[in-house]
Curated annotation (Swiss-Prot):
Its main location: nucleus. It comes from Mus musculus. This is F-box only protein 28. GO terms for cellular component: kinetochore. The lineage of its organism: Eukaryota, Metazoa, Chordata, Craniata, Vertebrata. It holds the Pfam family F-box.
Length: 368
């Protein structure tokens, strides 16, 4: 009944942008039976002072529709979204309130699903092999399937909702999504995903098919810029697939859909996270480069100190070698002048061996 009434309201100009009082009066006038013919008063009786007001002309100060929108929304919040979608038939003012609540309900159920999915993902392990054996694996599967269903509903309805041509019509789908999400939150061992989501898939598929077949053709004629292509070419628009395609492309360029904006926002967030990671890596690399430069400076200082020590050792060795030679020459001179000592050859051998050992040690140190 709600779907047929939505089609009828779309044909009449239905986006719900009209005066509430006039519609309620017109609708009640159509539902009221014709008044009986007036009878003349009997002779001798007095005529009434003023005619009685019909029910349609009674003051509406005490009716539900006359309340502020906030009060009406607070009252309707105790009802299901399916009942709210059926209340759109009451009058145009009630239609406006119900449309607003249905649109807000779809956005709220999306946020609630994102919150549930974030909580489940935080408890799951990061490895895919461990996730399959985890106790929350079925919870994650059900939430992933609900996310797919929400994406399909978003692509089907929200383009026209953002253009203020209609509202999110199937309130029963919102109720079913809430039922599934509450079931996932309250159950430790839920059933398989296809068993839990069978009803949601059925009613959402029927709602999307009916919307595409019956309501979208009516709404396409009301899209802003539907006749712009014909006026730009100097001729009236020709109905057909090409004209509809041109209209949709023009509208999509002028007013980007909500899905495209969401994708751009996600891409910006991803790029921002990547830039943050790169900045962190660059700062770490700079710290490492500074540490390496400090180590190189320390090594250069140590090398300079070692070079100075080696130079000092070489100078000392040269001085000792010179002194040793002088001693040996004096010893050889004294031994050759006397020629009587038997130990002079032994002293010469020892002196030559000492000189050779000093020379070898000096060569080895120079090589080092």
């Amino acid at each position: 009944m709600a779907a047929a009434s939505e089609e009828r309201m779309a044909e009449e100009g239905g986006g719900g942008h009209g005066d509430g009082g006039s519609c309620s009066a017109a609708g009640s006038a159509q539902r009221q039976p014709p008044a009986p013919p007036s009878q003349a008063p009997p002779p001798g009786s007095q005529a009434p002072a003023a005619p009685a007001l019909a029910p349609d002309h009674l003051p509406q100060n005490n009716t539900l529709v006359a309340l502020p929108i906030v009060a009406i929304e607070n009252i309707l919040s105790f009802m299901s979204y399916d009942e709210i979608s059926q209340l759109r038939l009451v009058c145009k003012r009630m239609d406006l309130v119900c449309q607003r609540m249905l649109n807000q309900g779809f956005l709220k159920v999306e946020r609630f699903h994102n919150l549930c999915q974030k909580q489940v993902k935080a408890q799951l392990p990061r490895r895919e092999s461990e996730r399959r054996n985890h106790s929350l694996a079925r919870h994650a599967d059900i939430l992933a399937a609900v996310e797919t269903r929400l994406s399909l509903l978003n692509m089907t309805f929200m383009k026209y909702v953002d253009s203020n041509l209609c509202c999110f019509i199937p309130g029963k789908v919102i109720d079913e999504i809430y039922r599934v999400l509450r079931y996932v939150n309250s159950t430790r061992a839920p059933q398989r995903a296809h068993e839990v989501l069978q009803e949601l898939r059925d009613i959402s598929s029927m709602a999307m098919e009916y919307f595409d077949e019956k309501i979208v053709p009516i709404l396409k004629r009301k899209l802003p810029g539907s006749d712009v292509s014909g006026r730009l070419m100097g001729s009236p628009p020709v109905p057909g697939p090409s004209a509809a395609l041109t209209t949709m492309q023009l509208f999509s360029k002028q007013n980007p859909s909500r899905q495209e904006v969401t994708k751009l926002q996600q891409q910006v967030r991803t790029n921002g996270a990547g830039v943050t990671v790169l900045r962190r890596e660059i700062s770490e690399l700079r710290t490492k480069v500074q540490e390496q430069q400090k180590q190189l400076q320390d090594q250069d200082q140590k090398l300079l100190e070692q070079t100075q020590i080696i130079g000092e050792q070489n100078a000392r060795l040269a001085e000792l070698e010179r002194k040793l030679r002088e001693v040996m020459e004096s010893a050889v001179g004294t031994s050759s002048g006397s020629g009587q000592s038997e130990e002079s050859p032994r002293k010469r051998r020892k002196a030559t061996e000492a000189i050779d050992s000093l020379r070898k040690s000096k060569r080895l140190r120079n090589r080092k």
